[in-house]
Amino acid sequence: MISSQKDSFLKAYKEGKNFIPIVETWPADLETPLSTWLKLSSRDSHGVFLESVEGGENLGRWSIVATKPLWEAICNGEEIVKTWNNGKTETHRGDPFDILRSWTKEYKSTMLDDLPSIGQLYGSWGYELINRIEPSV
């Protein structure tokens, strides 16, 4: 079942949203989040698999499986290179977190009522960036 029905999608788009989640749900006995991740990730080297359990194993469980990112960012010191999924690259200098904030301002997202309250930017940061958060570690 697609949770984000056509009418909801069109309404969000007309409101100026340009980042609208598409959600699919299915009975847990037909497929597992891990098996879905393994199938999708075998076609793409970049992706994210997040799982959560709220209220016990059988209640409120949700998973996020995301592949084929819009862009990838690689940081080396004060230089951050953004590579779009079409291969185009941009090089920026400055604080990686400030740069990321500026990049994400253009995305106007909407949340669906039946989704948990989560962000819509997924990825990972390298170990070296901990010094920007906890300088004494």
Regions found by a protein language model. Give the residues of each.
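Signature of the chorismate-utilizing enzyme
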Residues: M1-V137
